[in-house]
Amino acid sequence: MQSQYSHIVLGLGATGLSVVRYLCGKGITPLVMDSRRQPPGAETLASSFPEVKLIAGGFDCRYLVQATQIIISPGIAMNTPEVRAALDMGIEVIGDVELFAREIADRKPCVIGITGSNGKTTVTTLVGEMLREAGIAVAVGGNIGIPALDLLKENADIFVLELSSFQLETTHSLNCVASTCLNVTEDHMDRYSDMDAYRKAKLRLYHQSRSIIFNRDDALTIPTEPMNQNSFGLAPPEGDEWGICDSKIYHGHSEIMPITEVSLIGSHNHANLLAAMALVYAVGVDKQVMANVARTFTGLSHRCEVVGVKGGVTYVNDSKATNVGATVAALDGLSDHLGDIILIAGGDGKGADFSPLEEPLTKVTHLITLGRDGNKIAALKEGAIKVDSMAAAVAKAAQLATSGDIVLLSPACASLDMYSNFMARGDDFRSQVEQLDGE
C-alpha cells in the first residue's frame, strides 16, 4: 500500500472519469475507488490513465483517512460509513461541481444553474438553445450529458448546468448569475430522511446565485429568506413576474407570444418555458429570441414525447417520469384534453408515497399498471388493470382507446426493476406502439 494519496475519487463512471481527467491535467495522480466490482469506465481509465490505480468492490478506509481531499460521485451518499469516517476526521469531501466552481472562481458569474424534481433537463436544454440563438457561446451539461469539469474545455461565455440534489449536497461555491428550483416533489426518499432534507439540498443553490427564479405555484421553491428574486407561474403575473394571461405569455405587462404558438405540449411544459425565459433574461437575451426558440422547440425524448398516432389515438412517452410529482405534472398538463386518457404506470417506487396520485387519477379513464410497485398504484383506482410487460400494457391500452384518446406512459417510478434505465423503458414503449396496426 502506498503510504498516502492526497486526492481520492470515490465512484467512477462518467463523473469519476471527468474528475480523474481534471486532476491529472493539474499534475495530480488520484486514487479511484468504486463499490462496484466492475464499475463503468474502468476500461477507459486503464487505457487513458494507466498511472491511476483503481480499487473496485469497496472503499478502503486506510486510504480515505489519509487523504487531503475526497471527490465523491453524486450517486454515493454522504452518510456512507467510510465517507462519514473521513468527514469526522476533518477531511474535505466535495463533488465534481465544486471542483468546477473553484476552477472558474476568478471569472465574473457565468453559470446558470437549474435544479428541481422534474423538468430540469427540458429547462436546461431550452436555456442552452435560447443562448445559442442569441449568439452567446454556451456549454450545457452537469447532471445531463457532459460532466461539469469536461465543459471547461469548451470556449464558453455561459455554462448552463443541470444540478441534482445529490450534486448540490457537495457544492458550496458555485457563483451563478441566475438559478432556479423548478419544483420540489417527493423523490429519492431512499436517500433522504424526509422531504425537508430533500428540499434543503435543492435550495442550497439559491445561496450560490446572484439572481434566483422560483416557482410561485410551488411553495416549496420559495426562498426561506429575502433574496434578489423573481418568479414564474401559470397565473397572470404581477409586477415584474413571468406568467400567462389570456392565453399569452407575459413578463410583467410585456406580452411575449401567444401560448398557441408554443410547440411544447402540456401546462407543465409551459411552466418550464417560463422558467427558461426568466433565466436567460437575467443575462440579457432578447424576448424575440426567446419566442423564436419557443416556436420551434418540440421537447426531448421520453418527456411527454408523442411517439405515434394510431387509429386517431395519440401515444405519449413520458418514461422520464421516474417519480410521483412528474406523473402528477403530466396528468395536470394534459387535463384540458377532450378525449380519454389511458395511463400506463408502475415500476420501482423508491419508497415513495403514491397517495398524491389519487386525485389526478380521477382524470384518467383507464389505469394500467406494471412493475414492482404497480400494485400500490393500482390500489388507488377502482378497475385498474395489472399486466406484467410493456407489450401487454400497450396492447391493452390500444384495445381500450378510441379515436381522440391519449395513451400516456408516465410511470411515477424508476425503471430499474424491469429495465436498464428510463430510456430503455421508453424505447420499449415506442417499439410496442410502432408494432400496432392503424395509421
From Swiss-Prot:
It is found in: Cytoplasm. It comes from the Bacteria. Keywords: ATP-binding, Cell cycle, Cell division, Cell shape, Cell wall biogenesis/degradation, Cytoplasm, Ligase, Nucleotide-binding, Peptidoglycan synthesis. The keyword Cell wall biogenesis/degradation applies. SUPFAM superfamilies: MurCD N-terminal domain, MurD-like peptide ligases, catalytic domain, MurD-like peptide ligases, peptide-binding domain. One of its GO terms (molecular function) is ATP binding. GO terms for biological process: cell division; cell wall organization; peptidoglycan biosynthetic process; regulation of cell shape. The keyword Cell division applies. Pathway: Cell wall biogenesis; peptidoglycan biosynthesis. GO terms for cellular component: cytoplasm. It catalyses: UDP-N-acetyl-alpha-D-muramoyl-L-alanine + D-glutamate + ATP = UDP-N-acetyl-alpha-D-muramoyl-L-alanyl-D-glutamate + ADP + phosphate + H(+). Signal peptide: none annotated. Disulfide bonds: none annotated. It holds the Pfam family Mur_ligase_M. ATP binds at residues 116-122. It is an enzyme of class 6 (ligase). NCBIfam families: murD. Cell wall formation. Catalyzes the addition of glutamate to the nucleotide precursor UDP-N-acetylmuramoyl-L-alanine (UMA). Belongs to the MurCDEF family. This is UDP-N-acetylmuramoylalanine--D-glutamate ligase. It comes from Shewanella oneidensis (strain ATCC 700550 / JCM 31522 / CIP 106686 / LMG 19005 / NCIMB 14063 / MR-1). The gene is murD.
